[in-house]
Amino acid sequence: MIKIYDTMTRSLRKFVPLTENTVNMYVCGPTVYNYIHIGNARSAVAFDTIRRYFEYTGYQVNYISNFTDVDDKIIKAATQAGVSPKELSDRFIAAFIEDTKALGVKPATQNPRVMDYIAEIISFVESLIEKDFAYEADGDVYFRVEKSEHYAKLANKTLSELEVGASGRTDAETALKENPLDFALWKSAKAGEVSWDSPWGFGRPGWHIECSVMATEILGDTIDIHGGGADLEFPHHTNEIAQSEAKTGKTFANYWMHNGFVTVDNEKMSKSLGNFVTVHDMLQTVDGQVLRFFLATQQYRKPINFTEKAIHDAEINLKYLKNTLQQPLTETADEQELKQFVIAFQDAMDDDFNTANGITVVFDMAKWINSGSYTEPVKSAFEKMLAVFGIIFEEEVLEVDIEALIAKRQEARANRDFAIADAIRDQLAAQGIKLLDTKDGVRWLRD
């Protein structure tokens, strides 16, 4: 039985899907104006792991993750680069797909783009105006937060607490608002900006409305799980809830999940702080699976500190698991012990996808395998566990000449011609093939 920590209720709740054996997930994707950094990748890897575990347990998962390709940051970056916003966003969408593929992130069921949903966004905003949840002001359209019952309950804040923080704002946009907390659903276009015609003049969507529209258009008025980074809890997800539930009158998402930050020297990694490392740059020197394994070692809600040592440890641990998979199969293994490993793994992951405890079980099982318990069922169970973490090793294929050398060495050993056997071992070692002579035969692995 899977239990999820729901940010809305601040409690662990049993997962009950809207549709039996199906999970509908919407995870906020990147604003595509630059390469993603390791902190951004944490969200992609965390929710991919969650998706994979749902699939491991037999669920069909509809996994939707958007690309925000209309945004102030994109417009600014495109202007600086001398290209159109679409050219810039296309470039970094391609980079995101390439980077996350290297991290073993499965393709989403759909990756909607804001530019493809402009008509639906306009219709959504019109509906909110008709219901008196929104108003037009000088070409902009704002959402009335005071009309939203329990506004900001996701962030565990009251409207009065938020109003105190907003009371000192004096910018031009705030002057148009009925309440400083009201947020933009539609922004009037400035000269030279990308824009679309609407009942309120040329403009473009506000950030928050985009996800509400894409999520409900694809998955319906109520979805099982909405996820994203902890920094999206307020205001982004808070505003999504307000506008979505105002339009439909229904609960927007039954479970809210937020992943923790990647930190550097225990400070959040971010572009604004200038302490970030892009995945694109990291992949020049670090294998994608190593980076993935590092990100998966901590339970998704907890922060994870990025250090060279942590990456080095991930590399060593991954190599150990790979070598474990290359053990020669044995004829027998304790079936009850195998069953206990599987149960322990599921207990760990059922507890709010506790990957830290799940990986501990994996290493305990690897130790058991290395002690001589490695039948085909054991191998299958072990590979399925690793796949939950996105760790999938391709079968090593030995070239014909290497296979022949191993066979020739075995023949020499059988004939007690140890000089030839040792020479062949040295020859294989020079090609990166390490041989281990065990009671069950020759075990090999690549250095």
Curated annotation (Swiss-Prot):
Record's signal peptide: none
Keywords: Aminoacyl-tRNA synthetase, ATP-binding, Cytoplasm, Ligase, Metal-binding, Nucleotide-binding, Protein biosynthesis, Zinc
Catalytically driven reaction(s): tRNA(Cys) + L-cysteine + ATP = L-cysteinyl-tRNA(Cys) + AMP + diphosphate
Molecular functions (GO terms): ATP binding; cysteine-tRNA ligase activity; zinc ion binding
Residues where Zn(2+) binds: 28, 211, 236, 240
Location, primary (coarse class): cytoplasm
One GO CC term on file: cytosol
Binding site for ATP: 271
Keyword check for Cytoplasm: yes
Co-factor remark: Binds 1 zinc ion per subunit.
Highest taxon above the source species: Bacteria
Pfam families with a match to the protein in the record: CysS_C, DALR_2, tRNA-synt_1e
Its EC number(s): 6.1.1.16
Protein family membership: Belongs to the class-I aminoacyl-tRNA synthetase family.
The protein, known as: Cysteine--tRNA ligase
Native organism: Streptococcus pyogenes serotype M28 (strain MGAS6180)
Highest classification ranks of the organism: Bacteria, Bacillati, Bacillota, Bacilli, Lactobacillales
